[in-house]
Amino acid sequence: MNIQIVTVGKLKEKYLVQGIAEYLKRLSAYAKVTIVEVPDEKAPEVLSDAEMKQVKDKEGARILAKIPDDAHVIALAIDGKMKSSEEFAADLDKLATYGKSKVTFVIGGSLGLSEAVLKRSNERISFGRLTLPHQLMRLVLVEQVYRAFRIVRGEPYHK
């Protein structure tokens, strides 16, 4: 399986870089995983609704340019479906079983995802109703993808 994670902004925190690198190393036994960073749009702290939409649209265009046409796209969105780790694992396994070998996860910037990106996505998932920094979500996502492969194969890790 080829998994691509398209995300807005550069990862700055060393501890997150190290954690993600560790899970990418572990995942290499199961899938080819690549992370594609697109630049975030610089914006002032306080934005009008129109300005927020404009920022999301610009970031969204950058995201869409990185998604392969034949990819199954999963957007991480606060209004997405919440799943258990077992459900997430089963869903990833089904994608592989039904020939969806290219999966792209999308993590938006601090304002979220544009409507165009949400429309392009095949599904939306949420890791809960808490608001988490989008940089931290990268680590959470790669850990859950790793956990999913371990669950599907019945290997020890998931408790």
Swiss-Prot record:
Disulfide linkage: none
Record GO cellular component, one term: cytoplasm
Keywords, in A-Z order: Cytoplasm, Methyltransferase, rRNA processing, S-adenosyl-L-methionine, Transferase
Protein name: Ribosomal RNA large subunit methyltransferase H
EC numbers on record: 2.1.1.177
Subunit-structure text: Homodimer.
Function in brief: Specifically methylates the pseudouridine at position 1915 (m3Psi1915) in 23S rRNA.
Pfam family, one: SPOUT_MTase
Native organism taxonomy: Bacteria, Bacillati, Bacillota, Bacilli, Bacillales
Binding of S-adenosyl-L-methionine, residues: 76, 108, 127-132
Organism encoding this protein: Listeria monocytogenes serotype 4b (strain CLIP80459)
Subcellular compartments: Cytoplasm
GO molecular function: rRNA (pseudouridine-N3-)-methyltransferase activity
Reaction(s) this enzyme catalyzes, per UniProt: pseudouridine(1915) in 23S rRNA + S-adenosyl-L-methionine = N(3)-methylpseudouridine(1915) in 23S rRNA + S-adenosyl-L-homocysteine + H(+)
Source organism superkingdom: Bacteria
Similarity comment: Belongs to the RNA methyltransferase RlmH family.
